Amino acid sequence: MKAFSPVRSVRKNSLSDHSLGISRSKTPVDDPMSLLYNMNDCYSKLKELVPSIPQNKKVSKMEILQHVIDYILDLQIALDSHPTIVSLHHQRPGQNQASRTPLTTLNTDISILSLQASEFPSELMSNDSKALCG
């Protein structure tokens, strides 16, 4: 026997949401199976992209990750041994050498810019800027 409450649910349905058939997207916590399928899709895509992974053989997720790491390291070695890059490394000591900015720095900069942009009054933004921001 199921227990039930005579009190109605407090959740409101917006008329516009109901009439347009718009539903809220679930978070991964709400639907762990969708997260699992999404991760499996990502592993399948990695398997397609990395040339050293045999396509006709079943490989574990761990093997896929190992192949991906090896492939990234191989690409880094190939990039570092490219003649243009090698010539940059052999510059005179007084010259600036090109260095790669860590992604964490770039992500932090983007977050700061996003926060600053959200503080501007909307009337000061041009129509082009509004289209880009929202």
UniProtKB/Swiss-Prot annotation:
The modification Phosphoserine is found at residues 14, 25. Highly expressed in early fetal tissues, including those of the central nervous system. It holds the Pfam family HLH. GO terms for cellular component: cytoplasm; cytosol; euchromatin; nucleoplasm; nucleus; protein-containing complex. Keywords: Biological rhythms, Cytoplasm, Developmental protein, Nucleus, Phosphoprotein, Repressor, Transcription, Transcription regulation, Ubl conjugation. Residues 23-75 form the bHLH domain. GO terms for biological process: adipose tissue development; adult locomotory behavior; astrocyte differentiation; B cell differentiation; bundle of His development; cell maturation; cell morphogenesis involved in neuron differentiation; cellular response to lithium ion. The keyword Phosphoprotein applies. It is found in: Cytoplasm; Nucleus. The bHLH domain is essential for its repressor activity towards the CLOCK-BMAL1 heterodimer. Interacts with GATA4 and NKX2-5. Interacts with NR0B2. Interacts with CLOCK and BMAL1. Interacts with IFI204. Interacts with NEDD9/HEF1. Interacts with ASB4; this interaction promotes ID2 proteasomal degradation. This is DNA-binding protein inhibitor ID-2. It comes from Homo sapiens (Human). The gene is ID2.
